């Protein structure tokens, strides 16, 4: 530990890095904090209604496992997994998009006051920042990083919410979210395009995320990855469930928030 920074690979330095890739929800934004508590009960209820003989707790374990495994990918993949589980229990699933819209309706009900408050100015943007986000982004900008935001949340929502949080201008590389044609975009595809079209080398990537996917994608190309194991919404301690998954896919560092960004920079960019 380095204050609240857990260093899993002491020699992981980002001295060659030029590109920073960020996830959105749970990494820099807390607008959707609590989404797991919306998605999981919805799925548990749907599966429990199939009367497979499992207890609610047994079903919850199954749901938590695949929801966690797919965090960071487009939301539709979690709904495809739900459809698979419905079939396994002898049910006939509807289209995954049906379940995605059902989930988004429930989530919007939970977060509508947050969005409205940010939009009318009654809530300050930093209320829904992961602590230390702005100083971290400012520090990376000062180091000449080109920054990209890539999220599993729908494209129109990510762009709107990044703007409401007044974070959009930091991401000069662009803001990318999920598309209806979900196979046409992923974080891995974005990284591949940057390598092929922008001439970015794998070791020039620095990734930040609270989900399995972006950490794995950055590590696969040889970049350095910081696992942001936010215990939402306070984000003062490490969420052990997130930590285990992030460490499991090769995160170099684990942090609960960005408040120790200067210490993190000393580790990433030793002089």
Residue ranges and their predicted role:
Residues 65-142, 146:
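A metal-dependent, Asp-based hydrolase signature
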Residues 151, 207-253:
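Acidic, Mg2+-coordinating phosphoryl-transfer loop and its flanking beta/alpha structural elements
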